[in-house]
A protein has these predicted regions:
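STAS-like cytosolic regulatory interaction modules
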Residues: 1-51, 58-97
Length: 97
């Protein structure tokens, strides 16, 4: 299961972000993050599959529809491999700046 911990404008995502978790989070996707969230810090994600990546990109899309830029920063080592494998580098930032 994934956990979302809000710390001001940053939300720290940890745990498992897989298909099963995404199914349980999907209906709340529009309200899972505080409106002031500017970045999702992903270093503590233990495992993320394609459904998890799609969920993260959906959160970015929801914020973009409101005219807000939501950044995906500091992906975990496991997530970095997935990002490289599927050429998703344009969507993620190595470290929070």
């Amino acid at each position: 299961m994934a956990e979302f911990k809000q710390q001001g404008p940053v939300c720290i995502v940890s745990g498992l972000l897989d298909q099963q978790t995404v199914r349980s989070l999907w209906n709340d996707r529009s309200s899972i993050l505080a409106p002031e969230t500017a970045a999702l810090q992903l270093a503590e994600i233990e495992y993320c599959d394609s459904a998890g990546v799609a969920f993260l990109l959906e959160l970015v899309s929801i914020f973009a529809a409101k005219g807000i830029s939501l950044k995906l920063v500091s992906p975990s080592e496991q997530l970095k491999k997935f990002i490289t494998l599927y050429d998703l580098n344009d969507f993620f930032i190595e470290e929070a700046k």
